[in-house]
C-alpha cells in the first residue's frame, strides 16, 4: 500500500511542477488537453533558438547576461549535487537506525537550492507552444509543422491570452482535484518521509484522532474553447 501511495505522490508532484512552475506546451487539439515538455531556449554561437526555432542573434548586453547565467548554473549544479549527497547519506544512516525521526524529517523537508533566474531574452512568451488541431503557435507566430505561416493579428493575440489564462485555471483545477481524491483515500501524508517512519514508530506512539478530511469541493472548471487559427480536415 505504501509503495502505491509513493507512486501516487510522485505523479502528483510531477503534475504540480508542470502546471505551476513551467511555461511549456498548451494543448487544445482533437481529444487532447494537458501539458507536455519543451526544449526551451538554446544558444549556439550567440544565435537564439526557442524549441528549435531560430529567433535572432543575441545583443552584446544579452551575451554578457548569458555568460552570467552560465556561471550561476554551474554553481547551482554543484549545490544540487551537495544537497543530494547529504540526503543520500542521511537515508543510509536511517536504514541502520543511526538517526532519529526528527532529524530525518528535518532532512527531508530541507529545501533544494533555487535554480538561477532565466535570462531576460528567454521568456515564457518566447518558449510557450500552443498546439491546436493542425497547427502550432509560438511567440505569436503560426506554424504548420516547422513551416512558418504568419503572425497572429492583434485580435488573435488577445484570443490566445484569454485561452492561456483559462487553460491554466483548468489545469490547476485538475491538479487540485487529483490531490483531493488522494487525500480522501490516504489522508494528508504529503511528506514522503512519513511513508517509511509511520510503521516504525506506530507501536510507541499514542493513538491519535483520525484526521478529518475536508469535503469541500471546488466548482467544476470547464476546458476553454479552442481559438480557430487553423482548420484540420480529418
Swiss-Prot record:
Annotated signal sequence range: 1-17
Gene3D superfamilies for the chain: Pepsin inhibitor-3
GO MF, any single term: aspartic-type endopeptidase inhibitor activity
Region of interest (Disordered), ranges: 200-222
Subcellular location: Secreted
Compositionally biased intervals (Polar residues): 204-219
UniProt-listed CDD domains: API3
InterPro entries: Pepsin-I3 (IPR010480), Pepsin-I3_sf (IPR038412), Protease_Inhibitor_I33 (IPR051901)
Key words of the record: Aspartic protease inhibitor, Disulfide bond, Protease inhibitor, Secreted, Signal
Disulfide pairings: 135-230
Main localization of the protein described in the UniProt heading: secreted
Role, per record: Aspartyl protease inhibitor.
Similarity section: Belongs to the protease inhibitor I33 family.
Protein name: Pepsin inhibitor Dit33
Originating species: Dirofilaria immitis (Canine heartworm)
